[in-house]
């Protein structure tokens, strides 16, 4: 942890020296409280971006239209403080994120794929004018309890980015990874390390910004 902080400080100093005007984004995670919009943050004057998680299970606890009132309230909270917003991840594969009604068995991959596209499509259509960065997926490089293959997880990542791009061609899109140094490879055999997973996405020319 100390090494990571030292490395981040050194990189920031180098970046400031190289650029007359800093383009660095410094922010925090903005969770949705029970009373959405009531949250206040003492250090927000020092930040220029907030990360707004979007949980599929909370937005769509049962089949039907998404319930985005809390998300929209927090987006407006950030806009009222002239902050940029990174929204997402729009897809994770853990139990906390996926709705209980969704059949996520490995043999039902095509149904999950279709439901994921529909979910992301609804989000982007309703929020695209309020979001500055889309966080498409998180942690799909690593195996999960649901036993999806590496190819299926890569396909879901590509689908998420392509769905965003079909409905929003301009907003930057990012993808994040669990254990980017590949610690899980010591006990979980995979063909693609995190860096190769990322390289595959970059070579696909999907329009990912980071």
Language-model-detected regions and their locations in the chain:
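Substrate-binding cleft and catalytic face of glycoside hydrolase catalytic domains
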Residues: 45, 49-61, 72-182
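A short linear-motif detector with a strong N-terminal bias
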Residues: 4-9, 28-31, 112-114, 152-154, ...
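Alpha-helix initiation/capping motif
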Residues: 37, 67, 98-99, 108, ...
């Amino acid at each position: 942890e100390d090494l990571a902080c030292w490395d981040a400080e050194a990189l920031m100093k180098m970046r400031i020296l190289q650029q007359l005007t800093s383009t660095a984004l410094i922010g925090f995670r903005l969770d949705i409280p029970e009373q959405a919009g009531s949250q206040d943050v003492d250090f927000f004057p020092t930040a220029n971006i907030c990360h707004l998680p979007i949980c599929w299970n909370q937005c769509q606890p049962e089949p039907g239209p998404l319930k985005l009132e809390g998300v929209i309230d927090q987006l407006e909270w950030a806009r009222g403080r002239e902050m940029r917003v990174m929204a997402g991840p729009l897809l994770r594969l853990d139990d906390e994120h996926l709705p209980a009604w969704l059949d996520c068995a490995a043999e039902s991959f095509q149904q999950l794929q279709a439901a994921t596209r529909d979910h992301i499509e609804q989000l982007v259509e309703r929020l695209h004018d309020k979001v500055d960065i889309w966080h498409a997926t998180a942690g799909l490089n690593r195996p999960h309890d649901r036993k999806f293959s590496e190819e299926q997880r890569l396909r879901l990542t590509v689908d998420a980015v392509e769905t965003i791009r079909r409905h929003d061609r301009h907003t930057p899109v990012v993808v994040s990874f669990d254990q980017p140094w590949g610690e899980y490879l010591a006990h979980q055999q995979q063909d693609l390390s995190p860096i190769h997973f990322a390289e595959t996405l970059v070579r696909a020319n999907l329009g990912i910004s980071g």
